[in-house]
Design a protein with these regions (language model features):
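A polyanion-binding, active-site-adjacent surface
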Residues: 2-88
């Protein structure tokens, strides 16, 4: 199995773990809503891993934009804050 496929498989396992953690977070903390982007954005994430995971790199940078222009502020994935502001 190539590296990209291994990364995709690992991401699927992580997604299952996140799905199991969400109800716990919602019950035990002040979190009202939680989503798992590995579910709703899976096809795109998998394509990314399969395409770029086999390029021989030694580092895979993953992250989230929690700043004032990111999903943590609006709940809108991929930083589409303009869309959220004009719609809401």
């Amino acid at each position: 199995m190539d590296i990209g496929a291994q990364l995709a498989e690992a991401a699927q396992r992580l997604s299952v773990m996140c799905d199991a953690a969400i109800p716990v977070l919602e019950k035990k903390t002040i979190v009202a809503h939680a989503t798992n982007p590995l579910n709703y954005a899976w096809p795109h994430h998998e394509q990314y891993l399969l395409k770029w995971g086999n390029r021989g790199g030694h580092t895979l940078l993953l992250g989230m934009n929690p700043g004032p222009w990111g999903m943590a502020q609006t709940g809108v994935p991929f930083g589409a804050t303009g869309v959220a502001q004009s719609f809401l």
